[in-house]
Regions:
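Cell-envelope/extracellular polymer assembly enzymes that use nucleotide-activated donors
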Residues: 7-9, 144
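Short, well-formed alpha-helical segments that are part of the catalytic scaffolds
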Residues: 16-30
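Acidic donor-binding segment of Leloir-type glycosyltransferases
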Residues: 26-55
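Glycine-rich, basic loop-to-helix element that forms the pyrophosphate-binding segment
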Residues: 55-71
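Short beta-strand-to-loop acidic/aromatic patch adjacent to the donor-nucleotide binding site
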Residues: 76-87
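Conserved donor NDP-sugar-binding/catalytic core segment of glycosyltransferases
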Residues: 86-116
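A recurrent flexible, glycine/aromatic-enriched loop bordering the glycosyltransferase active site
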Residues: 108-124, 131, 137-138, 176
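C-terminal catalytic/acceptor-binding lobe
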Residues: 137-139, 143-194
Length: 194
């Protein structure tokens, strides 16, 4: 299974955790010219991929949209959105995208749904025209996308090997990110009448 039939892209926002990027890029099995790295701090470009710098205040949803918008501009079918601290095994991005295509799904992810989608890895059908709501700054935007996707079609779990190395570590150790998370939760609940 390769990305030769479907036009599958990948975007990764990254700050200071660049040590995993080379392995993610290699193991994604996505052509480097279809990879968008969104740098959130001053940093050197990653050779061979599309590099974008977004040094404005923290907003992971804006960072996701930067990659989504590039892929959409080039006519992509699907885009995978990954954190910069994942380990990929056995071609998970293509596996999810091809599974979504077969099931006519709008959104796919690699783990069973447990109240939240795994924000560290999800794949979006670009033709859905869904973008992340940039009112969210740090959390809940992935669940917002899930609810938007459910309004348009199927949201599916496709078993795939994606390991998240530092789950919620940044948030739990950063008071500012915790405040953003609380504000995002309040907005999410209000937006979806929860």
């Amino acid at each position: 299974m390769t990305d030769s039939n479907l036009d599958i892209w990948l975007t990764i926002p990254t700050g200071t955790r660049r040590q995993y990027l080379a392995d993610i890029i290699k193991e994604s099995q996505i052509s480097p010219e279809k990879i968008v790295i969104v740098h959130t701090v001053e940093s050197e470009p990653i050779e061979g991929v599309n590099n974008i710098w977004d040094l404005d205040p923290v907003n992971i949803h804006r960072w996701w949209n930067r990659g989504i918008d590039v892929a959409r501009t080039f006519g992509a079918d699907y885009i995978a959105v990954l954190n910069d601290d994942v380990v990929l095994k056995n071609n998970p991005i293509n596996k999810i995208a091809y599974g979504m295509n077969k099931l006519k799904a709008t959104l796919g992810y690699p783990l069973p749904y447990a109240g939240h989608i795994p924000g560290y890895c999800w794949v979006l059908d670009i033709k859905s025209n869904i973008r992340a709501d940039e009112t969210f700054r740090w959390w809940y935007g992935d669940d917002d996308i899930r609810l938007k996707a459910k309004e348009l079609g199927e949201v599916v779990y496709i078993p795939a090997e994606v390991e998240h190395l530092h789950g919620n570590h940044l948030t739990s150790t950063n008071e500012d990110l915790m405040k953003l998370t609380i504000a995002d939760k309040e907005y999410f609940d209000k937006k979806w009448n929860l």
